Swiss-Prot record:
NCBIfam families: lipid_A_lpxH (TIGR01854), PRK05340.1 (NF003743)
The protein, known as: UDP-2,3-diacylglucosamine hydrolase
Pathway(s) this gene product operates in, as recorded in its UniProt entry: Glycolipid biosynthesis; lipid IV(A) biosynthesis; lipid IV(A) from (3R)-3-hydroxytetradecanoyl-[acyl-carrier-protein] and UDP-N-acetyl-alpha-D-glucosamine: step 4/6
Subcellular location: Cell inner membrane
Catalytic activity, EC: 3.6.1.54
UniProt-recorded Gene Ontology molecular function terms: manganese ion binding; UDP-2,3-diacylglucosamine hydrolase activity
Cofactor: Mn(2+)
Encoding gene, per UniProt annotation: lpxH
Alphabetized InterPro entries for the sequence: Calcineurin-like_PHP_ApaH, LpxH-like, Metallo-depent_PP-like, UDP-diacylglucosamine_Hdrlase
GO biological process terms held by the UniProt record: lipid A biosynthetic process
Lineage: Bacteria, Pseudomonadati, Pseudomonadota, Betaproteobacteria, Neisseriales
Cofactor binding note of this UniProt entry: Binds 2 Mn(2+) ions per subunit in a binuclear metal center.
Amino acid sequence: MKPAYFISDLHLSEKQPELTALLLRFLRSSAAGQARAIYILGDLFDFWVGDDEVSELNTSVAREIRKLSDKGVAVFFVRGNRDFLIGQDFCRQAGMTLLPDYSVLDLFGCKTLICHGDTLCTDDRAYQRFRKIVHRKRLQKLFLMLPLKWRTRLATKIRRVSKMEKQVKPADIMDVNAAFTARQVRAFGAERLIHGHTHREHIHHENGFTRIVLGDWHNDYASILRVDGDGAVFVPLEKY
């Protein structure tokens, strides 16, 4: 049976065209063209200020994803903490299906819960408070009414502050809370969890379920999770 592929945390930006080139190479590969489905679990872009922003980066990525979709490859997207404002307009342009924060898939007989992963980091209370605020629909609507330049400046400032705060935060609170994560997996009746966000690529075998953490992408290394009837394995992008 055709495999499914999972990626997250590419953090694409015009400042790092090498990362965009890596993604486009994968999307154009025969492996992607023959996939059962491709799941992008958030932070595809380093930041997103609205579907009305038109750039060479956004357009080229949407165009290549659309080509896969037109070939019959299902492409799914879960919003991340950097690109949570991606909406239906961009997803339609790219031929992607927008998924909610949590979804359960039947992958080759294994009930699999997928999410970006930021909601699992409950020990980072400051971030969770911030997340709750910026996910308010009314606030998002007001933000998207601002001129594009204002939105970009505000997003850049918030990103700068977030980066500074991250440097002084204890590493453990930026990882998932084990107890909360286990409860979520049980609540959804899943046997496996796949998420990104923490950038700590690993396959964990925990009490009663498998937790797979996707890695972030770098110019010199990127990996893709391949899932098929034989299980799940990380494959270096260079193999494609």
